[in-house]
């Protein structure tokens, strides 16, 4: 078992947006973090399940199998052994036959015979004091030019390596007009971008993506990846087929959380609590959950309650809160008082990565020592934020790991992909935020075929088989592939199990060495719905079988060794 590594990663210039420092450390930490060999057999089985969809699309390796064709030339960018594009990533899509002929020209807004126009939104630290302070605290530069260079660098990779049917992806950058928390600015920016008539938008205002994405979709513009972070299911449903993100929906994450709690922390003694008195009590559950003034995340809370009930758990208390840093201490006092007065032994937390800092410190002030269960969160399951929580309290925290097991930078496939293609490292440390969104776009374009529209883009994502599912690669799929009992417009399908170890030493997600790391149970194994282990299994709080940071890739996750393109792009 590879254990934690404290070696320093290669130096990288740190220029960033709010997405990189605050919201999408989740992606930096591991989503699309490394590569593993694809499984042709599982791809072919999935193609049989989605036969009509695969047959209706371009000639792919999977379509050729279904039609019994063995003499299709898929070109030099295809690994004929795996049937996927020859890039060092488990998320490479199936190969398609190189295109010749007419592509239909202007098939959609932002699409011409030779171009796919996209807009990349970047935050402006000069207009956002909170963002600027966070960037400086992370040791980063306020210069946004390197982040634009990195966006363009990944676009260049997929322009060369993926099929775009005679077109190329063309990037226009848009600088935010206000801070990421300004919903009025977010809406105005979405309108201004929509008036440019792009095919899609990547990136968005971190705290206002629901407003931003909703406005873009309403105006017929696709919003992909970090454009639509933590998007509630109802927002996606009313905006089909314009919103696709990389992570699970909040409701999907809640469903996975409820299964985890039912199997690993169901009714019984609160054995992981912070003092003996609480450990000897039967579990009493409470939920602390983030929402917005207009109730965007009520669906998450309702789903969590419903799914907990299916697992024989009925919370005794709940407390919602808004993310208002000026009232953090007041909110914390309200939350802790309510949980303590209700006799809650087991607090289920779902929300942002800042609130637990105030809440855990207030819990200590009130001599309240419950179990803390980490549910659907944005970044509370990352070490960079968990180190800011009360360490004694958080040493009794455990839950679902939406992010996968971590690797140091020199084993990170997103980092190495850039180096492989360009011959140089990414210009800054936001590569983990950037690449997944560009890959999502390029995959949908390749799998859509020459007539590119939002509808064929959706079908392209749906016909691509699931990828990942190992300790350092979340399973990623869109459509209906068996992970969920419905057609799914969200990305990752699985989760691991973790707990906080305040004594572990190593790098956080922005490569700062310090005390405190999450331990991933059972070698960071991940589980889809219905597959979480029963109590006493799965290695929760078993240090010997856990991992903090892989110092070498598990054998099954070794990166494919392809020669780089001759021209380096």
Model-identified regions with their sequence ranges:
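Extracellular/periplasmic ligand-binding modules, especially the Venus flytrap/periplasmic-binding
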Residues: 352-358, 403-467
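Extracellular/periplasmic periplasmic-binding protein-like sensory domains
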Residues: 246-247, 362-436
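C-terminal region of N-terminal signal peptides and the immediate post-cleavage residues
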Residues: 26-49
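Beta-alpha junction/loop-to-helix N-cap segments that form part of ligand/metal-binding clefts
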Residues: 146-152, 159-238, 246, 322-329, ...
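Extracytoplasmic ligand/sensor domains, especially the bilobed periplasmic-binding protein
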Residues: 73, 198-318, 371-399
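N-terminal secretory signal peptides that target proteins for export/translocation
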Residues: 1-14
């Amino acid at each position: 078992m590879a254990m934690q590594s404290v070696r320093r990663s290669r130096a990288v210039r740190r220029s960033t947006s709010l997405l990189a420092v605050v919201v999408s450390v989740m992606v930096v930490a591991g989503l699309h973090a490394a590569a593993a060999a694809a499984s042709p057999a599982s791809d072919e089985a999935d193609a049989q399940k989605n036969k009509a969809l695969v047959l209706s699309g371009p000639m792919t390796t999977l379509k050729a199998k279904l039609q019994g064709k063995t003499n299709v030339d898929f070109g030099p960018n295809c690994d004929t052994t795996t049937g996927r594009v020859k890039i060092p990533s488990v998320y490479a899509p199936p190969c398609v036959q190189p295109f010749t002929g007419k592509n239909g020209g202007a098939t959609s807004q932002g699409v011409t015979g030779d171009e796919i126009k996209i807009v990349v939104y970047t935050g402006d630290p000069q207009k956002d004091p909170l963002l600027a302070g966070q960037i400086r605290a992370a040791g980063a530069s306020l210069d946004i030019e390197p982040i634009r260079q990195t966006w363009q660098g990944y676009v260049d990779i997929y322009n060369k390596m993926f099929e775009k049917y005679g077109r190329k992806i063309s990037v226009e950058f848009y600088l935010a007009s206000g801070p990421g928390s300004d919903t009025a600015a977010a809406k105005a920016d979405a309108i201004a971008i929509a008036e440019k008539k792009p095919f899609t938008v990547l990136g968005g205002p971190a705290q206002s993506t629901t407003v931003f994405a909703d406005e873009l979709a309403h105006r017929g513009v696709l919003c992909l990846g970090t454009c639509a972070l933590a998007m509630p299911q109802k927002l996606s449903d009313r905006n089909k087929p314009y919103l696709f993100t990389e992570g699970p929906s909040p409701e999907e994450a809640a469903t996975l959380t409820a299964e985890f709690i039912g199997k690993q922390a169901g009714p019984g003694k609160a054995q992981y609590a912070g003092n003996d008195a609480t450990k000897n009590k039967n579990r009493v559950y409470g939920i602390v959950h983030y929402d917005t003034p207009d109730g965007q995340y009520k669906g998450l809370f309702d789903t969590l309650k419903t799914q907990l009930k299916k697992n024989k758990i009925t919370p005794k208390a709940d407390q919602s809160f808004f993310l208002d840093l000026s009232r953090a201490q007041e909110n914390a006092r309200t939350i802790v008082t309510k949980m303590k007065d209700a006799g809650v032994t087991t607090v289920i937390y779902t929300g942002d990565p800042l609130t637990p800092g105030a809440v855990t410190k207030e819990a200590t002030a009130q001599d309240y020592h419950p179990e803390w269960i980490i549910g659907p969160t944005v970044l509370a399951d990352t070490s960079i934020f968990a180190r800011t929580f009360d360490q004694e309290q958080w040493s009794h925290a455990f839950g679902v790991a939406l992010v996968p097991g971590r690797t140091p930078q020199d084993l990170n496939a997103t980092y190495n992909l850039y180096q492989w293609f360009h011959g140089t490292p990414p210009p800054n440390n936001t590569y983990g935020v950037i690449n997944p969104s560009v890959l999502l776009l390029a995959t949908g374009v390749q799998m859509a075929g020459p007539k590119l529209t939002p509808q064929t883009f959706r079908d392209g994502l749906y016909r691509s088989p699931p990828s990942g599912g190992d300790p350092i690669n979340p399973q990623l799929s869109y459509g209906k592939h068996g992970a969920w009992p419905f057609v799914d417009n969200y990305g990752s399908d699985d989760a691991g199990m973790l707990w906080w170890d305040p004594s572990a030493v190593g790098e956080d997600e922005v490569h700062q060495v310090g005390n405190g790391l999450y331990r991933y149970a059972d070698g960071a194994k991940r589980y889809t719905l219905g597959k979480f282990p029963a109590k006493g299994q799965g290695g929760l709080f078993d240090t010997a079988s856990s991992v903090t940071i892989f110092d070498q890739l598990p054998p099954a996750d070794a990166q494919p060794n392809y020669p780089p393109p001759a021209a380096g792009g």
